[in-house]
């Protein structure tokens, strides 16, 4: 495991952590039972097969 050689200042630590951002998931349109819905791409197949309930929003 990497160990820092010197202590990092508070300002440098916070500016480094500020770069860590969560990204919004890209939504893709899918038609299920005649209704157009937007789901994340990784759930597209499950939504088409009816494995997830899209009405619980």
Swiss-Prot record:
GO molecular function terms listed in the Swiss-Prot or TrEMBL record: structural constituent of ribosome
Signal peptide: none
Any one GO CC term of the record: large ribosomal subunit
Cystine pairs: none
BP GO annotations: translation
Keywords per UniProt: Ribonucleoprotein, Ribosomal protein
Pfam families per the UniProt record, alphabetical: Ribosomal_L32p
SUPFAM superfamilies: Zn-binding ribosomal proteins (SSF57829)
Entry keyword Repressor: no
Similarity field: Belongs to the bacterial ribosomal protein bL32 family.
NCBIfam families: rpmF_bact
Protein name per the record: Large ribosomal subunit protein bL32
């Amino acid at each position: 495991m990497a160990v820092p050689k010197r202590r990092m200042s508070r300002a440098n630590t916070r500016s480094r952590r500020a770069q860590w951002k969560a990204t919004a998931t890209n939504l893709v349109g899918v038609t299920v039972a005649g209704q157009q819905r937007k789901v994340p791409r990784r759930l597209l197949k499950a939504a088409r097969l009816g494995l997830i309930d899209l009405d619980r929003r």
